[in-house]
Amino acid sequence: MAYSLWNDQIVEEGSITISPEDRGYQFGDGIYEVIKVYNGHMFTAQEHIDRFYASAEKIRLVIPYTKDVLHKLLHDLIEKNNLNTGHVYFQITRGTTSRNHIFPDASVPAVLTGNVKTGERSIENFEKGVKATLVEDVRWLRCDIKSLNLLGAVLAKQEASEKGCYEAILHRGDIITECSSANVYGIKDGKLYTHPANNYILNGITRQVILKCAAEINLPVIEEPMTKGDLLTMDEIIVSSVSSEVTPVIDVDGQQIGAGVPGEWTRKLQKAFEAKLPISINA
């Protein structure tokens, strides 16, 4: 039996009823997070929870629980489901009220939900690399907020899937931003390039870990926008997210990247990232 988070309770998944007038359902008026679980333990849990509260503040949504309470609820949800390896997803909406674009009265309670998903690490992708395609970035201008409004990303990801690609690498005009569900990096002449963390991208928690890994292996980081031309001439390309970890891209729209296999710096980053997993798990 599967269990879900329903506000401050862990309940049977099938017992939850969402109102058709929930603002998340009608407006996408809410935020979410996804945390990777290894061996029953959340990885970088505090960073994800901190970002959850930061996103809530940006959209003026009050979370009616402390960070410590939320952390305990997520821990209990994982334990109740006996989750070993996978993800825990949680979201909060601005609550249920008659449909109106204007915020509801402060007395309307927010609605917190969460669930878990079992899933092993994508070792084959890490080892062999994946294909990607370039797609115009048509999302809104507050990509730094982990909003429930994901239609632009959904359309891009679908386009990539239909082309037989793992990811859609997004660009606004000629400038590379990120992917439909990941951050993107290029490595050229021993330097790591990635878009700066501003409103055009989500400052991924995995991204933050990777930048620390780069410093540890003496790989200089340049946070500057890349052009499409820059990207296609990189020696190596990687994408990162909670599920992707450090995934090499070996082909973009049929153009081989580097030698067409995961590169030396990618392997070093993967090794440095992997080394952090037990550190966080035991923290």
Swiss-Prot record:
GO terms for biological process: D-amino acid biosynthetic process; D-amino acid catabolic process. Its EC number is 2.6.1.21. It holds the Pfam family Aminotran_4. One of its GO terms (molecular function) is D-alanine-2-oxoglutarate aminotransferase activity. Its cofactor is pyridoxal 5'-phosphate. Pyridoxal 5'-phosphate binds at residues 51, 178. It catalyses: D-alanine + 2-oxoglutarate = D-glutamate + pyruvate. Gene3D superfamilies: 3.30.470.10, D-amino Acid Aminotransferase, subunit A, domain 2. The modification N6-(pyridoxal phosphate)lysine is found at residue 146. CDD domains: D-AAT_like (cd01558). Keywords: Aminotransferase, Pyridoxal phosphate, Transferase. The active site is at residue 146. Substrate binds at residues 32, 99, 101. Belongs to the class-IV pyridoxal-phosphate-dependent aminotransferase family. Acts on the D-isomers of alanine, leucine, aspartate, glutamate, aminobutyrate, norvaline and asparagine. The enzyme transfers an amino group from a substrate D-amino acid to the pyridoxal phosphate cofactor to form pyridoxamine and an alpha-keto acid in the first half-reaction. The second half-reaction is the reverse of the first, transferring the amino group from the pyridoxamine to a second alpha-keto acid to form the product D-amino acid via a ping-pong mechanism. This is an important process in the formation of D-alanine and D-glutamate, which are essential bacterial cell wall components. Homodimer. This is D-alanine aminotransferase. It comes from Lysinibacillus sphaericus. The lineage of its organism: Bacteria, Bacillati, Bacillota, Bacilli, Bacillales.
